[in-house]
């Protein structure tokens, strides 16, 4: 399977630069995966396509201010992106500029408050051992910036708009963007209608947004990301599967959690790291539906969606979305695949 099989034409002006004023007023393209039938709607009308008993599973991760700016001890500015926490003091990070970020280099972000030393090089970045005074999360909130994807050029006025309204557990370098469309009112309306909700956790890191560089996609190696599924969520998913009710993932991160822990059509409580790479031919055990945004050409996310709905159907839907000027990527419009 070739990387070019997942390419499509996207005019740059369709890449959404800012969130809409109201989260649930984004457009919704509904794709029926059996027939390829497409319906166009607005996200706040999601209820029309659900039935009482459907289980929506969301990712409760929260984006951290993962961009830090500092200087090397020897001089010269440096920027890092926190990607994965290794232990209490050590993080895997991306460093810019990378060519002078050698093992042993000391970095100063706020003198006496937050400093670090590069202690190792990894396949994708560096390991930094931080020294700090106080609580790391509080220091990060003071010094760090919310990381936005590189295709978003405009400054975000309200960082909360890059968080889902149910974000709880800090740890992500990027938002699980399918959830950005939900409002408290919409969730209440769906619950009143009989739709159930469950929460899992996946801290979004490089595994989600690392570009594919190999022409043969099977040679791509996913970066691992931390996940948790607790007992309550596992029980809700298993009950829905036993009773023949639909399990609908809100976002590709939820798909990867549920399918990582799937065993014979059931899930068990678990925590750990997943590097699950889902591409066409994958055997889905848990999910029956997917809410997701429109993804970058040649991305692992587009491959996952293609695995679930069929590559031709997905690329046809994308072509129609481009023609109808849907908004793409993180702050863009949504798809519901059922």
Curated annotation (Swiss-Prot):
NCBIfam families, alphabetized: PRK00147.1, queA
GO CC terms for this protein? Answer: cytoplasm
Q: What do we know about how this protein assembles, alone or with others?
A: Monomer.
Which enzyme type, at the first EC level?
transferase
Q: What is its EC number?
A: 2.4.99.17
* Classification via InterPro entries: QueA (IPR003699), QueA_dom1 (IPR042118), QueA_dom2 (IPR042119), QueA_sf (IPR036100)
Native organism is: Carboxydothermus hydrogenoformans (strain ATCC BAA-161 / DSM 6008 / Z-2901)
| Gene3D superfamilies xref list | QueA-like
Task: Output the Pfam families linked to this UniProt entry.
Answer: Queuosine_synth
Keywords of this entry = Cytoplasm, Queuosine biosynthesis, S-adenosyl-L-methionine, Transferase
Protein's pathway? tRNA modification; tRNA-queuosine biosynthesis
Put simply, this protein is called: S-adenosylmethionine:tRNA ribosyltransferase-isomerase
Q: What is its main location?
A: cytoplasm
Q: Which family does it belong to?
A: Belongs to the QueA family.
Q: Where is the signal peptide, in residue numbers?
A: none
Compartments (UniProt record) = Cytoplasm
Biological-process GO terms, alphabetical: queuosine biosynthetic process; tRNA wobble guanine modification
Question: What is the role of this chain?
Answer: Transfers and isomerizes the ribose moiety from AdoMet to the 7-aminomethyl group of 7-deazaguanine (preQ1-tRNA) to give epoxyqueuosine (oQ-tRNA).
> Entry's PANTHER family?
S-ADENOSYLMETHIONINE:TRNA RIBOSYLTRANSFERASE-ISOMERASE
- Example of a GO MF term: S-adenosylmethionine:tRNA ribosyltransferase-isomerase activity
Q: Which reaction does it catalyse?
A: 7-aminomethyl-7-carbaguanosine(34) in tRNA + S-adenosyl-L-methionine = epoxyqueuosine(34) in tRNA + adenine + L-methionine + 2 H(+)
């Amino acid at each position: 399977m070739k990387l070019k099989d997942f390419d499509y034409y996207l005019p740059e002006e369709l890449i959404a630069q800012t969130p809409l004023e109201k989260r649930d007023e984004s457009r919704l393209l509904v794709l029926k995966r059996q027939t390829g039938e497409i319906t166009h709607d607005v996200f706040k009308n999601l209820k029309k396509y659900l039935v009482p008993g459907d289980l929506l599973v969301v990712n409760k991760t929260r984006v951290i201010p993962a961009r830090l700016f500092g200087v090397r001890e020897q001089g010269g500015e440096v920027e890092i992106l926190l990607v994965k926490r290794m232990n209490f003091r050590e993080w895997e990070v991306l460093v810019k500029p990378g060519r002078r970020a050698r093992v042993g280099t000391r970095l100063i972000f706020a003198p006496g408050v937050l400093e670090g030393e590069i202690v190792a090089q990894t396949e994708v970045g560096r390991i930094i051992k931080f020294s700090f005074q106080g609580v790391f999360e509080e220091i990060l909130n003071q010094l760090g910036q919310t990381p936005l994807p590189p295709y978003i050029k405009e400054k975000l006025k309200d960082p909360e708009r890059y968080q889902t309204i149910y974000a709880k557990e800090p740890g992500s370098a990027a938002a699980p963007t399918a959830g950005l469309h939900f409002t408290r009112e919409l969730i209440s309306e769906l619950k009143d209608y009989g739709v159930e909700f469950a929460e899992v956790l996946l801290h979004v890191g490089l595994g989600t947004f690392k570009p594919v560089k190999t022409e043969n996609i099977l040679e791509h190696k996913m970066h691992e990301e931390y996940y948790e599924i607790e007992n309550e969520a596992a029980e809700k998913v298993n009950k829905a599967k036993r009773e023949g009710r639909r399990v609908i993932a809100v976002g590709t991160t939820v798909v990867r959690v549920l399918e990582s822990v799937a065993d014979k059509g059931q899930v068990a409580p678990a925590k750990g790291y997943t590097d699950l790479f889902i591409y066409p031919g994958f055997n889905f055990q848990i999910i029956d539906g997917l809410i997701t945004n429109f993804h970058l050409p040649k991305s692992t996310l587009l491959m996952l969606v293609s695995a679930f709905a069929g590559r031709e159907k997905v690329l046809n839907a994308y072509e129609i979305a481009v023609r109808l000027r849907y908004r793409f990527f993180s702050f863009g419009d949504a798809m519901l695949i059922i």
